[in-house]
Amino acid sequence: MEPIVSKRWLLARMYEPNLVIVDCRFELGRPEAGSAAYDAAHIPGAVYLDLEEDLSAPVTEHGGRHPLPAPDTLAARFARAGIGNATRVVAYDDQGGMNASRLWWLLRWLGHDDVYVMDEGFAAWQAGGYPVTAERRTVVPAAFTPSLRPHMLAGVEDVRRALGDPGVLLVDSRAADRFAGLQEPLDVKAGHIPGAINRFWKQVQGDNGSWKSDGELREQLAPVIAAMDEGREAIVYCGSGVSACPNVLALHRLGYPQVKLYAGSWSDWISYPENPIATNEE
C-alpha cells in the first residue's frame, strides 16, 4: 500500500477501531503552537504527539537539534498514545508533511509498517469541509514491542566514512541557500557536508501542497535513484533529521526502502569541530 493516503481515504476509515490518527503539527521557534492548534481543532479521534517532547530526545552536545529517542523510550510513548504492534497509524501535520514523515520514519525504524501520511495536511482537511473537533480522544494504552531496523539509520561515523567514497551518495534536503552556505537561520555554522548533492525536501510536493506523482518524484530525485540503481548507498540528511524524512518517504514510495537517514543531520555534523564543511558546490 502507498505510504501517502488521501483525505477521502482517511474519512472512510477514521472510525475503525484499530486506527490511530496522530496530529503532528509543530512550528520551529514556536514550540507551543502545535499543541495549541490541536486544542483548537483537529481530526476527530486524533491524538497529539509533539515533535520535541514526544518524537525527539533532549538536546545534548551531539545528536543534533532533534535527537532520536532511545527505541524503548519511543515505543513506550507510542504505546501511551494507543499505538500497538497491530495498530494502523495515519499521521498529519500542517508543515508540508515533514513532521508526519518523521513519525512515519520513526515507526518504521521500530519495525512498524502499517503507518501512513495524509496528503495535504490539516488545513486542507478543514478547508474541504471534513469533520473537525476540539474534543480530546480518551486513549487506551496499547502494547508496543519494537523490532529495530538499524539499517535505516546512519550515524556520524557512517557519514565520515562516506566522504570520498564513490559507493555512497549524500543527499542534503535543505533549501538551496542553506546548502550553499549563503545563510543559516537555525544552526551556528553554514554550508553542507562535502560531496553532498542538494534536493530540497519541499520539491516532493506540488504548488497545491499535494505530493507529486511517481513520475514527478522520479524526475526530482533522479540522481539519487540513478545512484541506488548502480548499487550505491544513499544517506539523506537535513538540519536536524526532520525535513529529510519526506525525501526518504518519497524514495520508499518509489521502491527504494534501503535509503538511510542521518538522523543527527547538519546540526549533529557541525557539533564536531573536526568535521569538514563545504560551500557553493553541487
Give the positions of each predicted feature:
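Cytosolic catalytic domains that perform sulfur/thiol-centered chemistry
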Residues: 1-282
